[in-house]
């Protein structure tokens, strides 16, 4: 019986060195070693692993030994080198052992000659690097922009920002992979193949490990519960990140603008706003994005893909998180409650935005005019006013819009769709915001109260307009004549005096109107509706103007 030693294949750690490795490095080491020995076992069924007084992988990871699979032990004498003892009957030649060793080296650690930027990346756990990380050093450097990173995984993510998500046509991705299974799964990141599907919600994944982790969100007990909002989590890391939303602990601070963030991922995304880097470009319309998530979300606007369906109402969504938030409408689950006014919300985003109505925080400021905004989406729409960028164009009338929300609302003026219906009176609405304001008429809920005169309002828009009556602020200025207005809608109507635009056209007689109010009054001429009645003569008129003129001449 001959023994084959794998010192030139496996990484040799002492037990003291092993104790210094973090969990991610241990997991990587375990996965590589297990696959290596599975591959070796497939070469010969008689493979056996022997150690004297050793500490096993199961002891280190707290896992039970499988009956179907023999897992190697760490040898004694303060070494984690592996020794293979196998019956070499039929395989006893020296050439066979040489070939076997070469085979294991190739399978275990594929050496990378250099990725697309010329740097070599070696993915084996390295104790020296680990000690550097502990000392606060950042040993991984990008050769393209010289940015340094603490972890290899961070460098790899950063490298993708230079090349985009996909390799150029006809070229293969040259990123280094430890073993064939990692290389195979990495290939899926380039092809976007996601063959592993969750049976509970339909979400798909590129790797079985991601699916296994996701399944726990459906089945596993959530042991970490937040005392403030009673939200529960599977993992301690997720729980810790959530707690920061209550404590306002923001450990990641931008040195350029001073903004602080709860999550490192959010901080990294923010840093790209200073560099202006947008590596993800849409092949359909040419629009570029800073983040891959935003790029993927945008792509679905072209494909119309909505793989996530609500089982209760049949509504479909492009994103799983949007489906989860939607499900709370059916369950009535409102996890986020405001301590100031008691209002509860189904989504964290809505809750954070609501809190700013109490604090007055407007973190998004326009560099051109100094105007500040509560929401990033509103800020982006405002910026397009300066750049005159109009991404959304109506195919029916040619009108263009700076925001998708305004564009969708405009489309409903053509289709007549009013998807929001009041359950109390049956009235329908084109906009969700208008619907919410209407509901408050029934509930008599008035969230916004003026400190100057005590008047209360059901909508923030009406409240903001009212405040301008006290301050005299008129932020909307006509570029042609310099006249200023309190409301943006008033400015739009005024601009039509200069352009002569008449967007409201009567389908019955072909007449066009500049203003929607004039158009409505005209429609009543066709329908015969007379909603304005004179109290003195009990005579009705189709519009308020005619009633007012009649009253002035007769009374």
Swiss-Prot record:
Its main location: nucleus. It comes from the Eukaryota. Coiled coil: none annotated. GO terms for biological process: regulation of transcription by RNA polymerase II. One of its GO terms (molecular function) is RNA polymerase II transcription regulatory region sequence-specific DNA binding. Pfam families: KRAB (PF01352), zf-C2H2 (PF00096). It is found in: Nucleus. Keywords: DNA-binding, Metal-binding, Nucleus, Repeat, Transcription, Transcription regulation, Zinc, Zinc-finger. A zinc finger (C2H2-type) spans 140-162, 196-218, 224-246, 252-274, 280-302, 308-330, 336-358, 364-386, 392-414, 420-442, 448-470, 476-498, 504-526. PROSITE patterns: KRAB, ZINC_FINGER_C2H2_1, ZINC_FINGER_C2H2_2. May be involved in transcriptional regulation. Belongs to the krueppel C2H2-type zinc-finger protein family. This is Zinc finger protein 57. It comes from Homo sapiens. The gene is ZNF57.
């Amino acid at each position: 019986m001959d023994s084959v030693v794998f010192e030139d294949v496996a990484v040799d750690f002492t037990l003291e060195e092993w104790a210094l490795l973090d969990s991610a490095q241990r997991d990587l080491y375990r996965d590589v070693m297990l696959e290596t020995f599975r591959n070796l076992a497939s070469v010969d069924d008689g493979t056996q692993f022997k150690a004297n007084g050793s500490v096993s992988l199961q002891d280190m990871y707290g896992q039970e030994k499988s009956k179907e699979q023999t897992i190697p032990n760490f040898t004694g004498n303060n070494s984690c080198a592996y020794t293979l003892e196998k019956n070499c009957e039929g395989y006893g030649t020296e050439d066979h052992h040489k070939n076997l060793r070469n085979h294991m080296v190739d399978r275990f650690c594929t050496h990378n000659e250099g990725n697309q930027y010329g740097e070599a990346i070696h993915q084996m756990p390295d104790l020296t690097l680990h000690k550097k990380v502990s000392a606060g050093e950042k040993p991984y450097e990008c050769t393209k922009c010289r940015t340094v990173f603490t972890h290899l995984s961070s460098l790899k993510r950063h490298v993708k920002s230079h090349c985009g998500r996909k390799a150029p046509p006809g070229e293969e991705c040259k990123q280094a992979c430890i073993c064939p299974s990692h290389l195979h799964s990495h290939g899926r990141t380039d092809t976007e193949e996601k063959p592993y599907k969750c049976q509970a919600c339909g979400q798909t994944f590129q790797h079985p490990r991601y699916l296994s982790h996701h399944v726990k969100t459906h089945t596993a007990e959530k042991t970490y519960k937040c005392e403030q909002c009673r939200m529960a989590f599977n993992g301690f890391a997720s729980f810790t990140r959530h707690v920061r939303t209550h404590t306002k602990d923001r450990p990641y601070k931008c040195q350029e603008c001073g903004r602080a963030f709860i999550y490192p991922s959010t901080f990294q995304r923010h840093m790209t706003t200073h560099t202006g880097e947008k590596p993800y470009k849409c092949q359909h319309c040419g629009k570029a994005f800073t983040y891959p998530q935003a790029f993927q979300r945008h792509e679905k606007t072209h494909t119309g893909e909505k793989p996530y369906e609500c089982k209760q109402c049949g509504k479909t969504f492009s994103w799983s998180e949007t489906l989860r938030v939607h499900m709370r409408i059916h369950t009535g689950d409102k996890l986020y409650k405001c301590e100031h006014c008691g209002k509860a919300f189904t989504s964290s985003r809505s809750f954070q935005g609501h809190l700013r109505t109490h604090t007055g925080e407007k973190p998004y400021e326009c560099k051109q005019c100094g105007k500040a905004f509560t929401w990033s989406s509103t800020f982006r729409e405002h910026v397009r006013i300066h750049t005159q960028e109009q991404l959304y164009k109506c195919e029916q009338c040619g009108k263009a819009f700076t925001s998708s929300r305004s564009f969708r609302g405009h489309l409903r003026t053509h289709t007549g769709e009013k998807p929001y219906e009041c359950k109390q009176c049956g009235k329908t609405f084109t906009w969700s915001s208008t619907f919410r304001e209407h509901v408050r008429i029934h509930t008599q809920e008035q969230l916004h109260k003026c400190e100057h005169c005590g008047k209360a309002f059901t909508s923030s828009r009406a409240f903001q307009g009212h405040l301008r009556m006290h301050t005299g602020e008129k932020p909307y200025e006509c570029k042609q004549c310099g006249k200023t207005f309190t409301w943006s809608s008033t400015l739009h109507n005024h601009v039509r005096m200069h352009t002569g635009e008449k967007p409201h056209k009567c389908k019955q007689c072909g007449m066009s109107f500049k203003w929607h109010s004039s158009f409505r009054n005209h429609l009543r001429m066709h329908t015969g509706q007379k909603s304005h009645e004179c109290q003195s003569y009990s005579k009705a008129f189709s519009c308020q103007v005619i009633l007012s003129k009649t009253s002035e001449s007769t009374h």
